[in-house]
Regions:
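A short, N-terminal amphipathic alpha-helix
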Residues: 28-44
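Short, high-confidence coil segments that cap the C-terminus of an alpha-helix
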Residues: 42, 95-97, 127-128
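Catalytic donor-sugar/metal-binding loop of nucleotide-sugar-dependent glycosyltransferases
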Residues: 195-216, 221-225, 229-235
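Short phosphate-binding loop-to-helix
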Residues: 52-101, 109-117
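Conserved SAM-binding loop
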Residues: 21-22, 47, 102
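Short internal beta-strands
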Residues: 45-49, 133
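N-terminal nucleotide-binding beta1-loop-alpha1 segment
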Residues: 1-16
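Conserved core of the sugar-phosphate nucleotidyltransferase
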Residues: 81, 108-200, 208-211
Length: 235
């Protein structure tokens, strides 16, 4: 069973050079990179980016560089296309990953034990297509979502028909949001299938949640401050 880590991050972002901005004295991408490097279960390490600064810093962390084409570095580029491109390059080098740990460069919220526990889930149950971190957030349950009608008034985002929806959040059931820190993919049952649920079809149709208390990915300067606070409290 071959397990490979793939760190992903592009240079073209709204917060300039966010993936390499310092958080508590280290480049942002070093946090997921180092967490993966400390895993005893991962065999190989690659980084995919269109940005040479990202590639060089990740290489310093022990990751082999994959320079992605420009069309995979745009804001509207899809993660699945980045993953497939990287897997193609990895296979050209003679490797054929069974499990791929996709690491997102713009987060500090990754721990080695989290990665290993997700990996062990798939190793124990090979029918699982992916294991992904999630957080519970009942305050933002989709049943509570609204939109504006043509006259500018609020209306339910969904048409519930005659169904009565409770305003008590404890009565409306689970609401789990996918984290953007890392995803563990059982490659043959996920990336190359089309049976998953939108918008992450590449994760396959047997996705196990790995519940976290909190997670953040960086898009603003305020996110950097929150990330620093998390690092000081957790690492």
């Amino acid at each position: 069973m071959q397990i490979t880590a793939l760190l992903t991050g592009r240079g073209n972002s709204t917060l300039k050079d966010k993936n390499i901005l310092e958080v508590c004295g280290k480049p942002l991408l070093a946090y997921p990179a180092e967490a993966a490097r400390k895993s005893s279960l991962i065999d190989e390490f690659f980084v995919s980016s269109d940005d040479e600064k990202i590639l060089s810093i990740a290489q310093d962390c022990g990751f082999k560089k994959i320079k992605r084409p420009a069309d995979l570095g745009r804001p509207d580029s899809k993660h699945v296309d980045v993953i497939k491109h990287a897997l193609g390059v990895i296979k050209e080098e003679g490797a054929d990953p069974d499990i791929l740990v996709v690491l997102l460069a713009n987060t500090v919220c990754v721990k080695t034990e989290w990665i290993d526990e997700c990996l062990r889930e798939i190793l124990k149950t090979p029918t699982i297509s992916a294991v992904v971190p999630v957080v519970s957030d009942l305050d933002h349950h989709p049943y509570r979502a609204k939109k504006k009608d043509e006259d500018g008034f609020l209306e339910p985002f969904f048409d519930f028909g005659d169904r009565d929806i409770s305003s008590n959040r404890e009565e409306i059931g689970d609401c789990l949001f996918l984290c953007h820190n890392f995803w563990v993919l059982n490659v043959k049952k996920s990336v190359y299938t089309d049976g998953g649920f939108s918008p992450w079809k590449f994760m396959g149709d047997k996705v196990k949640p790995y519940e976290l208390d909190w997670s953040i990915d960086v898009h603003t300067k305020e996110d950097l401050i929150r990330s620093e606070n998390w690092v000081k409290a957790n690492l």
